[in-house]
Amino acid sequence: MTTHVILVARAFGAKGVYIEGKDEKMVKSILKVIDSWGGSSYFLVKEIENGKSIVNEWKEKGGTIIHLTMYGININDFQDRFEKIKYPLLIIVGAEKVEGWYYHNADYNIAIGNQPHSEVAALAIFLDRIYKGRELYMEFEDAKIKILPQKAGKKVIRSG
């Protein structure tokens, strides 16, 4: 699931991810995607030991912490605040049970609905709302593989 969250983060415009813990195989897989599909200077992947320290650093620097959770306020009720959010954003998505500390230290707990759902879907919808669909046209200059959109069929352009 973590790999899918990272792929969505990259494809939907996030500038990078922090991964709590070590997973060499997963990081290697993501770096391979970045090498082929681009984004090496745009999208950073960093393994960390303690997510709480990143949250505290982010707050000290004046950024905003968004925690995506089914227990938060509905994203539709948050819509008018998107223009007023202080950047940079740190978006927290958690697998399984997230510690209560994150709920209390996030600036906003936002739900993509109050039913059980995937972190992948929540992140995709949230980023799409922030970027208003512009992220769907994003291209990376250093991509070795690019898709040329087709009405029918598939066209892939390879370089390097």
Swiss-Prot record:
Highest rank taxon of the organism: Archaea
Subunit annotation: Homodimer.
Assigned protein family: Belongs to the aTrm56 family.
Entry function: Specifically catalyzes the AdoMet-dependent 2'-O-ribose methylation of cytidine at position 56 in tRNAs.
One Gene Ontology cellular component annotation held by this UniProt entry: cytoplasm
Pfam families, per the entry: Trm56
Gene Ontology BP terms: tRNA nucleoside ribose methylation
Origin organism lineage: Archaea, Thermoproteota, Thermoprotei, Sulfolobales, Sulfolobaceae
Protein name per Swiss-Prot or TrEMBL: tRNA (cytidine(56)-2'-O)-methyltransferase
Localisation per UniProt entry: Cytoplasm
Gene3D superfamilies reported for this sequence: 3.40.1280.10
GO molecular function, one term: tRNA (cytidine(56)-2'-O)-methyltransferase activity
Keywords: Cytoplasm, Methyltransferase, S-adenosyl-L-methionine, Transferase, tRNA processing
Protein source organism: Saccharolobus solfataricus (strain ATCC 35092 / DSM 1617 / JCM 11322 / P2) (Sulfolobus solfataricus)
Catalytic activity: cytidine(56) in tRNA + S-adenosyl-L-methionine = 2'-O-methylcytidine(56) in tRNA + S-adenosyl-L-homocysteine + H(+)
